[in-house]
Amino acid sequence: MRILILMMLGTTLAFGETKPADTVERCQSMLTEAVHDRNPDGRKGAAEALSLVRLKDNALEFLGPMLDDHDVEVRIAVVTTLGDFRDSRTLPLLKKALKDPVPEVDLAAAKVLYQLHDPEGVQFLLEVVGKETKASSGYFTNEKRGALRMLHTPTKLFIYIGIQAAGLAPVPGLGFGLSSAQGILSAPDSSARAASLLLIGSSRDPTLADTVGTALSDKEWSVRAAAVHVVATHPFPQFREQLVPLLDDKKGAVRVRTAAAYIRLQSSAKVQPARQGAGIH
């Protein structure tokens, strides 16, 4: 029996021995082939898989050229993967993506930049929500601004941003508002502007209050609902009385959030949510 085991072991070693270096080379070849796959689903899968490697393993060398892919879903996957690294070395590529001609890619890049605490991210999102001013950064032309505002946000891109709701530390008995955010974003006619406002709802940017105040009377119901949500969760108690007219809003989703926000703000002076530090969520 012992001899048989030794023979079997020898056979296994003879036919199954593979050097680690050879396996690594094979893996790199597989990723390279996937990155250049003729099928966009294959390239998208490669971009997603690259979120599992490290930057020092040439991830950026793979991902950089993919930002020029002709398929939008591939470019969005690249931006998402760049965000997974949470590393400042990805910033040049993310800022390139911020200038993509397709609004969905721009928004995905802005979201990641905001999470990395890069000022260009929050500025871009504020401009999506607010009105064009002389101080606007010029990130996009009037045509792109119009396209961004007309965009109905793909739920899969933004549905989870309420989880960052928005940087609140747990407070017993105080709701995060996650369900409220998801409800707004999952509506088929919810806009990218509403998603952008929810995303920056925890920002300490000094212009956010003005943006929220203006959004309370926006023509799009999802933006009004998002503004009410941010008034409650940020919070902005100074807008409490401005909520009263929205109790008669023509959209039920706005009315019920307004009622809840008004009640919540009644005790906001007594219970203030503790905020986390500057860590990325």
Regions flagged by a language model, labelled:
Residues K134-I184:
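Acidic, serine/threonine- and proline-enriched intrinsically disordered linkers and terminal tails
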